[in-house]
Design a protein with these regions (language model features):
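Helix-loop junctions and terminal segments of transmembrane helices
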Residues: 55-70, 143-144, 203, 261-293, ...
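Interfacial transmembrane-helix starts/ends
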Residues: 4, 41, 73-88, 122, ...
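Alpha-helical transmembrane segments of multi-pass membrane proteins
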Residues: 99, 112-138, 189, 301
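Alpha-helical transmembrane segments of multi-pass membrane transport and lipid-handling proteins
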Residues: 80-109, 164-172, 192, 268, ...
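Signature of the first transmembrane helix
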Residues: 2-59, 90, 94-98, 128, ...
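N-terminal membrane topogenesis motif
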Residues: 1-21, 73-76, 80-81, 118, ...
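Hydrophobic alpha-helical transmembrane segments
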Residues: 123, 152-200, 258-261
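Interhelical loop/hinge segments that connect adjacent transmembrane helices in multipass membrane
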Residues: 2-3, 149, 176-179, 192-235, ...
């Protein structure tokens, strides 16, 4: 069954980078020290929370591509409208992080000796936000076409770079700025790989905003935006609060167990990403019912 096959590909995309991430993060924790490593995990959270600037377009474009899979003209409008809007909005998000970087750093309750390094790091981090969101958007095109093999080969390479490159930079210069520079380079590599996979569709789309298509994307994506705001807040805000109340060094000790628990969601996430395009283009109620039952039963089977 294609759902199971695609779910396995999604699991591979999660598991392989973890084999690099675990030792890489361990080395960075040792090299940077508790405070700077704690801030690094918060920096990762900032990029993740930047998903609010996605406006639900990643899920919307997966759905739309699945629905209009055989309509070349409409696909071009979908890709162009989503890319143009998201590039503008994510650039605004990056600018906001640049402008308020000093305020963010003050809130994190760090030692004065590390202020310059951390402040410069957050300014550099702001550049990763448009890159991160565009990458997510372009990969969503492949997900809409159910090309999960290509998606997860890209994810495996990209996430391995994202996990390992910061540690590599820290080997040569043990500062947070070096770690964020490594993160930025790895995000650029990830975006380039995504572009190569969908370059023909991006180039041929014409990069023009179509208002009718855009309204349809936003109407669906707007509901997901609510989840994009609430979910990261529930997952990441505890780190900001711990840093503010106890100091950034305590975040390093908290993040490890927290991330381990978060990994328990890998299996349902893998199945969910595989089944979403099928649900989007399912034409009959019986088909929807069958896919929904699979969605519910597959992630729970290993636990039973």
């Amino acid at each position: 069954m294609s759902i199971i096959k695609n779910s396995i590909w999604n699991l591979v995309g999660y598991v392989i980078p973890s084999l690099v991430a675990i030792p890489a993060l361990g080395y960075m924790a040792h090299k940077l020290g508790p405070e700077l490593f704690g801030i690094y995990t918060i920096a990762i959270a900032v990029v993740g929370y930047a998903g609010i600037f996605d406006m639900g377009l990643t899920r919307a474009i997966t759905r739309e591509i699945a629905i209009y899979r055989n309509n070349s003209a409409e696909r071009k409008k979908i890709i162009a409208s989503a890319t143009v809007f998201l590039l503008a909005l994510s650039t605004l998000g990056g600018c906001l992080v640049q402008i308020f970087s000093a305020s963010i750093v003050h809130f994190l309750n760090i030692t004065a000796a590390d202020f310059v390094d951390i402040n410069n790091s957050f300014k550099l981090l702001a550049l990763t936000i448009p890159i991160f969101l565009l990458n997510q958007l372009w990969i969503a095109i492949l997900e809409g076409d159910e090309k999960f093999k290509a998606v997860n080969i890209q994810k495996s390479f990209s996430s391995t770079f994202i996990a390992g490159m910061p540690a590599l930079f820290v080997i040569f210069d043990g500062t947070l700025l070096s770690a964020i520079a490594g993160l930025l380079i790895s995000r650029i590599i990830s975006l380039l790989i995504a572009f190569l996979l969908v370059r023909n569709e991006i180039v041929q789309s014409g990069m023009r905003l179509d208002l009718v298509t855009f309204k349809r994307l936003i109407f669906f994506g707007g509901w997901i935006t609510v989840s994009n705001i609430i979910s990261p807040a529930m997952v990441y805000f505890d780190r900001f609060i711990i840093s503010n109340m106890l100091g950034a060094r305590h975040v390093a000790y908290y993040s490890g167990p927290s991330e381990a628990i978060a990994r328990l969601g890998i299996l349902p996430a893998a199945v969910g990403r595989a089944i979403f395009p099928k649900l989007s283009c399912a034409g009959h109620k019986d088909e929807l019912k069958r896919l929904s039952l699979i969605h519910i039963s597959e992630p729970t089977r290993p636990r039973l």
